[in-house]
């Protein structure tokens, strides 16, 4: 193991002088290990840059807090009360205020570790939250940040007497935890090649989407790496089940968000929060580059709910995803 250069990072939420030193795997001969996920992402980023492009990435990670003192997994008690959460509180300001001590410590640790934590929201599940990380033109750092953020959340939760999980589907009836990846591409002049001044975005954006959709079934193992991951990928659960794309459509696997043209990008919504961020970003960037270089054309963007339409299906089980991955030439 050799340090990545990101650290040592002091654990701000513990009293002892303890630090984390992120490392990468190397072979005895001194070469980087071919199975190191960070190295795989570095290799893909190198290919994107060799094509004259710079990927810009931002991540969104969802997680659940739970009561570690209870028998079985249960939602947490609301701080300052003896009341347990009994329902989700989507976008609740009151809930964020109640957990302010927890989120304040999250932001303090992120600032100390140069993890660009931005907006925090309460999600639809009981004790479920999401934190957005700001975009960066360093895709490897984006993956580092996502991994470090998960470490921070778990550690700060322990400080507050809570548990935190990024499991894809911790509760059978509540929403799963997603890892959403926003991506745009800059040319050598720094211009966003996905922006052509329209809401639809440029033909290059369409080609990137085509690459994503074409490779998505074969790549699902990266996005859903565990048996539990496939419990999240179910219809009507705020998670995609098809290789599909749409304009500002949250049932799609690939969403083109509304907003300023200069920020035109795609949002990849398949991955669970349990996925390896290095492998997810590597797979997404490689797929987008494949589509761009082939000048591929995607199917027509769908409207409405993807759950109600005949669209190409993603693997529905771990076994199916393994078979698709093993026989893929991507």
Walk through the language-model features, giving the residues of each.
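Glycine-rich, acidic/polar active-site loops that bind/position phosphate-bearing ligands
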Residues: 1-330
């Amino acid at each position: 193991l050799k340090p990545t250069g990101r650290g040592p990072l002091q654990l701000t939420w513990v009293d002892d002088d303890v630090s984390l030193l992120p490392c990468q795997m190397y072979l005895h001969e001194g070469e980087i290990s071919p199975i190191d996920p960070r190295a795989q992402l570095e290799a893909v980023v190198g290919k994107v840059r060799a094509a004259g492009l710079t990927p810009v990435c931002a991540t969104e990670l969802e997680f659940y807090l739970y009561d570690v003192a209870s028998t079985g997994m249960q939602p947490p008690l609301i701080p300052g009360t003896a009341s347990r959460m009994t329902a989700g509180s989507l976008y609740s300001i009151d809930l964020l205020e109640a957990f302010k001590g927890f989120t304040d410590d999250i932001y303090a640790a992120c600032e100390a570790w140069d993890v660009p934590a931005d907006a925090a929201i309460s999600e639809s599940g009981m004790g479920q939250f999401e934190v957005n990380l700001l975009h960066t033109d360093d895709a490897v750092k984006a993956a580092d940040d996502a991994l470090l953020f998960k470490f921070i959340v778990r550690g700060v939760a322990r400080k507050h007497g809570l548990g935190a999980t990024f499991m894809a589907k911790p509760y059978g009836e509540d929403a799963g935890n997603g890892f959403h990846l926003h991506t745009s591409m800059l040319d050598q002049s720094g211009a966003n090649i996905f922006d052509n001044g329209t809401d639809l975005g440029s033909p290059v954006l369409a080609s990137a989407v085509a690459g994503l959709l074409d490779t998505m079934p074969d790549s699902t193992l990266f996005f859903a790496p565990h048996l539990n991951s496939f419990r999240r990928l179910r219809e009507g659960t705020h998670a995609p089940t098809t290789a599909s794309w749409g304009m500002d459509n949250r049932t799609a696997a690939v969403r083109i968000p509304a907003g300023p043209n200069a920020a035109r990008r795609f949002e990849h919504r398949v991955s669970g929060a349990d996925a390896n961020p290095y492998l997810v970003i590597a797979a997404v960037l490689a797929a987008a580059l494949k589509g761009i270089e082939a000048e591929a054309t995607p199917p027509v963007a769908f409207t409405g709910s993807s759950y109600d339409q005949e669209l190409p299906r993603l693997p529905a089980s771990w076994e199916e995803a393994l078979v698709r991955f093993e026989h893929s030439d991507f």
